[in-house]
Amino acid sequence: MRSKGRARKLATSNECAYGNYPEIPLEEMPDADADGITSVPSLHIQEPCSPATSSESFTPKEGSPYKAPIYIPDDIPIPDEFELRESTMPGAGLGIWTKRKIEIGEKFGPYMGEQRSDLKDSSYGWEILDEFCNVKFCIDASQPDVGSWLKYIRFAGCYDQHNLVACQINDQIFYRVVADIAPGEELLLFMKSEEDPHEPMAPDIHEERQHRCEDCDQLFESKAELADHQKFPCSTPHSAFSMVEEDLQQNLESESDLREIHGNQDCKECDRVFPDLQSLEKHMLSHTEEREYKCDQCPKAFNWKSNLIRHQMSHDSGKHYECENCAKVFTDPSNLQRHIRSQHVGARAHACPECGKTFATSSGLKQHKHIHSSVKPFICEVCHKSYTQFSNLCRHKRMHADCRTQIKCKDCGQMFSTTSSLNKHRRFCEGKNHFAAGGFFGQGISLPGTPAMDKTSMVNMSHANPGLADYFGTNRHPAGLTFPTAPGFSFSFPGLFPSGLYHRPPLIPASPPVKGLSSTEQSNKCQSPLLTHPQILPATQDILKALSKHPPVGDNKPVELLPERSSEERPLEKISDQSESSDLDDVSTPSGSDLETTSGSDLESDLESDKEKCKENGKMFKDKVSPLQNLASITNKKEHNNHSVFSASVEEQSAVSGAVNDSIKAIASIAEKYFGSTGLVGLQDKKVGALPYPSMFPLPFFPAFSQSMYPFPDRDLRSLPLKMEPQSPSEVKKLQKGSSESPFDLTTKRKDEKPLTSGPSKPSGTPATSQDQPLDLSMGSRGRASGTKLTEPRKNHVFGEKKGSNMDTRPSSDGSLQHARPTPFFMDPIYRVEKRKLTDPLEALKEKYLRPSPGFLFHPQMSAIENMAEKLESFSALKPEASELLQSVPSMFSFRAPPNTLPENLLRKGKERYTCRYCGKIFPRSANLTRHLRTHTGEQPYRCKYCDRSFSISSNLQRHVRNIHNKEKPFKCHLCDRCFGQQTNLDRHLKKHENGNMSGTATSSPHSELESAGAILDDKEDAYFTEIRNFIGNSNHGSQSPRNMEERMNGSHFKDKKALATSQNSDLLDDEEVEDEVLLDEEDEDNDIPGKPRKELGVTRLDEEIPEDDYEEAGALEMSCKASPVRYKEEDYKSGLSALDHIRHFTDSLKMREMEENQYTDAELSSISSSHVPEELKQTLHRKSKSQAYAMMLSLSDKDSLHPTSHSSSNVWHSMARAAAESSAIQSISHV
């Protein structure tokens, strides 16, 4: 049995050991001793009448300050032989004084009170312990009308003052007299053990929570220590507790005896005395533990801050406030005033008007009044039970500890413990529709031409090309998926999303908002066999714009496979050869991707300069259209004949699908330029009108549009400044809508094509066009001269420099349509041309396309749909009835509105507060959610003041300024002299040295090969993807001849490709990758000197390029480099490498192209060969390159086309890349 609050009950005595210390109150209870209730009949208390009680003996008492007037409660009956008056213990209040002599052995009790689980006031209660020293329950007598007169017996301040001890007998507390008590003396209870007679602080302050041994009265900090102590017999006599129970004779007669018994072992830290060495050693463990709260004026430390504060009062002697009526001292004047009100003048001055009960404080009276008014302001949130006191509510709420999830959300079924948490959850849950099977768009809208969307029909629509559902397997996802986890499409997108999942005004007009062209004009404008109709979606203008500036080079293709051309067509041969993707007027890329410039300033600046360049499109096509009009009509005869057979929507789907396939073909030509064309097969089987790539998705990608939706009359010439201050998106929209010009001429024209004798030959300057080559699109930024006119190279600048052009030779044309520039929205990681983890290049791709529902919500195709939808909104101003037409179509592109609900498995229990309304991801803090939302919205609020780059995260902006502009690299590697901007990057770099990955040796493991190959591949992929970005995002350069345009693209622009790649991917790369790219940028500047070798982390560079004038030699070199790479032992890995054998040496061709730019000599060219490269490193580069290229192709792939499959070089490249990526995915898992 022990008292829970002994430390707070302790008060120092002004007579013994505490004379030198100011009295420190440990707790003041306003109503501790002064609550009066008349519910119990009171006994009349007489004055002391014992014969032994003389006036002399009471003189000091009467003359002491304790005789100050205090309130004597009469609610508890006091026996006649005792009286209740001021205690001699400072701060204790009232005490029990005897009127007669009490001898040793008398018992008083039991201690009365309420049985509770815990003590409300530890000064008026006891804890009842079981045999294992566990608290069974508590006896609480803190209420004024509860308990017996025993609760007024106070604890002694010193050991020699006590005359009573307490013991527990049968779950009851009794007091036993252990010393003779003379009349007029106060009954004082045993408090401290005999080893603490002179310690200024109570034992509980040092030991926090004591556990007493009933045999020797030794205190322990934990029950485990007490149990260990009780395993051995105690060396000290039995304590007073055991004496009461066993009726033993009290033999502790003097303090000197205790000194002899307990003075053997002293603690050097706290001066405590222990009976034996074992107890002292256990006690010393408490000093070895680190205590969090240490006193700054003495070496003492405490585990609780309250104990430290209480201890520091002993040092702050000048900050005490003494009571004038008693010896009590306070550290705060408010505590002193509260003490005076409750114990002295004006005590319990607040009386209840209803029952007359008085209270020391107004708050106590206010709380008491709730009883009379039946007001219960404290309500349980779980069961809505109400209480008048908050403590009662807290006690009640513990009952709900085992059933905290009692309230269920009616919408999603999630359980909550309180109504407040449920209400917070409903903000995100109510009004949502959970994912369910069914069409994504308007209900009842079926795909034109197909009664049902089953797997068989999808395969048939794709013309035997395996769709993505077949590609990823049939047992992983339901049948009819256009991409993983997506049900079928309806209305060109059946079953992609549940209807009503997003809310947005309909965007697709049911009928053309503008008048169409005549059939003759359409026939003239349909230049590509893949384009059955002239209209091209406005969302596809970015790639088209870049196509005009950077035609991908295809000169390294074997010419012997090209059809024969007539002599009249030779002036166009060079142009056609250089741009395999130039039959494309418009390619759709989702804004926000890294295939285009993602920063807001780049978007706006490009937009301003595009208008000047693109308005000249029609002129260049008019100059070339006459020889091609007949052929265009013939090649599209089948499609035009189908107009009378199929519905308009089917024709429109065919047209749009062809446009997208052309887009893919354009990107493929760039990839083929960098990845090389060696190993491609079936080029001689190419046919006119063939699909450039197998359909990656079995259904048409874009929605259907009517045939006459996009008329594009000629534009007039108007000059705009090349570089202006960036404008806000709203200003850009105003500028676009206010202009009468269209940013792009979407008219397409096809050149006449005739067969050419097969055989190796160099490309000549005579114009001719192969039937397999896409048409050359000449946008306003590129002049289409008939010869090989040379112009000055493009300057190294992100925005380019305006060049002179033969603008006087171009007929002007009018524009009636203006399309809104796309704003970044979905920044899907598949578009972010980031450096994938070198350990598994295909991991990000697998994660993107194999993730569970609802990952398809942000598939790259959906990003393209969103961009297209945004651009379609710009048509609302073209025609008065356009807005009505837009509203007549079901909502298809409601991507901006939050989903109605998310699947229950996505809703986390609790913390539903910060949930992404687009993808359902949950974040612990609002700042994390804000940063995450920028990945959906494309917002980049942090703009660099030096280069107008924008970032979505402020830390990326700071790193950009520090590393790019300030060139701060204070951390230098002592092994290779490489510098880093951060210490962590240097440490990561040094680990590569330690692991041997920086040596470039062939003895490293495949994992280390991947790491060491990353730096080599960085330059290649940066060059490749930078050109694609320029292909998409830049239209600020003057016209160039075709040959010099290629030199510009791979020449001077090659110097800033690393910086541009860094700026485009700064938000996506980690710190080391940013540092690496900055270093690569500096290295590229050194490469401007022709013939200067390039260093790349101590590894031999692999990039080789083929001079344009030595095509035959380059082709022979590439053929000689086709030695089979060393295979890994894994069988599945062999298939992955063999599938990509045709792009093994894309790095070699890249270096050859660079040497062409720098005009390497033949000797230098022959000295560079891929034979110097370890085969294992080649395989690493092949795996990474194929995954990067495959991701690029996959993001722009069409789902279906109505044309037969072709075997063009681009088609073969894409088909094999896809198969290799599939096998490599399996290999990557097994490899890891």
Swiss-Prot record:
Start and end residues of each SET domain: 80-192
Ranges of compositional bias, category Polar residues: 588-600, 758-773, 806-816, 1032-1043
Organism domain of life: Eukaryota
Phenotype of null mutants: Mice develop until 9.5 dpc but die before 11.5 dpc. At 10.5 dpc embryos display multiple malformations associated with hypocellularity and reduced body size. Required for neural, heart and paraxial mesenchyme.
SUPFAM superfamilies named among the record's database cross-references: beta-beta-alpha zinc fingers (SSF57667), SET domain (SSF82199)
Entry's Gene Ontology cellular component terms: cytoplasm; nuclear speck; nucleoplasm; nucleus
GO BP terms: apoptotic process; embryonic forelimb morphogenesis; embryonic hindlimb morphogenesis; forebrain development; hematopoietic stem cell proliferation; heterochromatin organization; in utero embryonic development; inflammatory response
Locations listed in the record: Nucleus; Nucleus speckle; Cytoplasm
GO MF annotations in UniProt: DNA binding; DNA-binding transcription activator activity, RNA polymerase II-specific; DNA-binding transcription factor activity; histone H3K9 methyltransferase activity; histone H3K9 monomethyltransferase activity; histone H3K9me2 methyltransferase activity; protein homodimerization activity; RNA polymerase II cis-regulatory region sequence-specific DNA binding
Record's compositionally biased regions (Basic and acidic residues): 562-577, 608-622, 791-805, 1044-1059, 1089-1104
Acidic residues bias (residue ranges): 25-34, 1068-1088
Tagged with keyword Phosphoprotein: yes
Motif window: CTBP-binding motif 1: 743-747
Protein name in the entry: Histone-lysine N-methyltransferase MECOM
